[in-house]
Amino acid sequence: HQHHPVRPRPDWVMLVIVLATTAAGLALQYILRQPFCAWMGIPPENSLANQFFYFAIGTGLLFLGYFMDYTILGRHIRLLYALWLAVGLFLAFSPWRVEYNGRLFYTAQWIWFFPVLFAGVLYSQRGRGAEGVRNCLLSLLGMWFLAYITPYMSALGILTVVCCGMLVMAVRRGAFGRCTRGRLVLAVSPLLALLGYFLFLLYAVPHVRERLALVFHPQADASVAGYQGSAIQYIMFGIPFAGSGTIDGAQWIKLDGAGDWMLLSVKYLWGWTAVFLLLAAVLLLLAWGFRIARRQNGLLARSVCM
């Protein structure tokens, strides 16, 4: 039969939201990096070079996405899957690989493209019943392998949840035939396996139990192993550190304020109002994205949007 390309129509509101929030994020990082850059003796703009580079690439891919024929994902999924895995292995084992904090940096970035690839897997396996659901789950093995060798276990967990969510939605909407309890259980089986593994770690590894306890009660830590939780409580609520160690949470957060501690830095500098405004922008981005996904009728379009 004749092939009909599937290309999305631009959602200009979403484009404006994405570009505005990204630009605001870059400006926020520039402001928050100044204490760290002053401490290191480097210009703030130099530390943002990588961020601007990724911003340019992301913006280009965003607009390029409106000219792409997404049925390619379904028609050539085996080739695309093999290329994705080959590039990931090259980034992991090539002489030019970059390691940062014990993690393969470029491989860690590459892994996050997998959900788009998984949308193509869903599309290619539609109508195949339980066999199609099984094949979709088998495609997760490549992502798990790359995440394991990177190592990037948080990405493994997050992407597994995302892909299983996409698969469950496809099963419930009848993409693999009649929705049955067996197919739903099969679709969520990786999540059940992750839960079982986590419970096993809680039982078998005392260190895991200790670290989890510090999340809920960091002040009970006398060896300062839970310094992050203590710093969070200090910055957010002014609760002093009660262990035997010492930590200048405010100064430490200020020096690392443009990374994982951005929200804490915003609270420390500008108060709760700024925190709620920042969260509102992120929630607006997520809400509009899910709104676009819910408006799609086809499996491929809905999966790519998700």
Regions found by a protein language model. Give the residues of each.
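A structural signal for hydrophobic alpha-helical transmembrane segments in multi-pass membrane proteins
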Residues: H1-P95, S139-L140, M306
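Membrane-interface segments at transmembrane-helix junctions in multi-pass inner-membrane proteins
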Residues: F93-G127, Y148-L156, A220-A222
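Transmembrane alpha-helical segments and their membrane-water interfaces
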Residues: P44-H76, W110-R128, G165-F176, A287
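Membrane-interfacial helix-loop-helix modules of multi-pass inner-membrane proteins that assemble, modify
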Residues: F36-M40, V87-T107, V205-F216, D248-A250
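Hydrophobic alpha-helical segments of polytopic membrane proteins
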Residues: A130-I149, M153-L201
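Hydrophobic, glycine- and aromatic-enriched re-entrant/interface helices and adjoining loop segments
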Residues: C179-L277, L300
